[in-house]
Amino acid sequence: MGYHAGMSYDLIVIGGGPAGYVGAIRAAQLGKSVVCVERDRVGGTCLNWGCIPTKALLKNGEVYENIAKRAAEFGIQAEGVSVDWPAVIARSRAISDRLSGGIAFLFKKNKIDHVAGEARILAPGQVEVTDAEGATTLLEGKNILIATGARTREVPVFPFNGKTIIGSKEALTLPTLPSSMIVIGSGAIGTELSYVYHCFGTKVTLVEALPRILPNEDDDVCTAMERAFKKRGITCMAGAKVESLQDHGDSVTATITAKNGKTQEVTADVCLVAVGVVPVVPQAEGLQLTERGFIQVDDHYRTNLPGVYAAGDCIGGIMLAHTASYEAEQAVEGMFVEGHTPQKPTLVPGCTYCHPQVASVGKRERELKEAGVAYKVGKFPFQAIGRAVASGETEGFVKLLFGAEHGELLGAHIMGEGATELIATPELGMSAELTDADLNAMIYAHPTMAEAIHEAVLAADGRAIHA
């Protein structure tokens, strides 16, 4: 289409991440004129500094670990294997570049204009964009979708210096491979990067203030994951508090109070602080925010400003890339599809990409207990699954939670090889309101990791075949 002065759009999208670019494309598919404003690279944090580059590094790490540490297990002799760290980082960045370029292509294909710069909402229907040189452009449109995402939360007492105390973005482009690393926070980001650096030989100490690592997961997963990490040589300190960080220029010392009350000092080349994110909110006079600083929206993703909507991490809730995309699609269809009632995400899978992988959807067992829900548990280990044994990937299990009376699937928790792919089956089952009887009626291909799902269904009634 091509932007020109005085042009008015059906939709101005602020932010080109998983919410912004998906919302822009959906609006274009509906025949609307769209412009997307992005101050950095299209694709957002996920594609450029999160989901995608971490998965690239993870694959690099797994390849190295399998060759250097497990080759003999498969009858292969490998000697003199080493890491070319600059090449590792370069591959990760090249993948992000490729996919960001793919989104730029999709913008052209769908006739979406792209304006680079920082956006400021002057009034409903008016957005001012300031580019890197300070020049301003005025955009006008009938609707505005704010999809500005979130950024790494920086703890005031642990200020980033870009060298020894860093956030996740810096962890993806470290110039040299550190020999040791302290990671504060064991959510998905902290856990994944702990595993990645461990693969390459970095001595990792993972510190979590809550009683378990991966604290948002089911208790069985938390316990098993901590055991798996410790077996690999990753030091896990759950229920611990980092009292202070002392920067030495080329290293950093953390003073940590363990859960037993004892204080110890840990020194490492670098400390990664991964304790969550905070919303990024554009300048907009009168825009209503929540107490935590997120943009306040109603059930239709509308803000308090007329014609201004918001979706994705900037509105809080379940802050995942796939949730953001869903919310943006719902918001856009609510704007332009007559009779459409936008939906809020309710059934959202969560995935952690380390080894073994972790994936979950629905309720955790402790939630059912606290709510007084009558339930039954089906749990089955991968070590009894033929494909897992043949692949040398026997760690982990499938755990399914069913309603005691009707057998409805209430939650699914998978830890093991391919967990992030396997979770789609129970998610679909929950979405379709399938029962344990329905899931048992399916035929599961053999030999596959998915057979553990079938065995877990049977195990809920004490009928597992290979137990």
Please provide the spans of the model-predicted regions.
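Glycine-rich flavin
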Residues: G2-Y9, I25-K32, V37-L177, T205, ...
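Short hydrophobic core segments
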Residues: I12-I14, A119, L138-G149, V183-I184, ...
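Flexible, glycine-rich terminal cap/loop adjacent to redox cofactors
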Residues: I14-A19, I25-D40, I52, A56-V63, ...
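Residues forming the Rossmann-fold NAD(P)(H) cofactor-binding site
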Residues: Y21, T191
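Gly/Ala-rich phosphate-binding loop of Rossmann-like dinucleotide-binding domains
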Residues: A24, A28, S194, H198-C199
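FAD-site-proximal beta/loop scaffold in flavoenzymes
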Residues: N161-L177, E265-V337
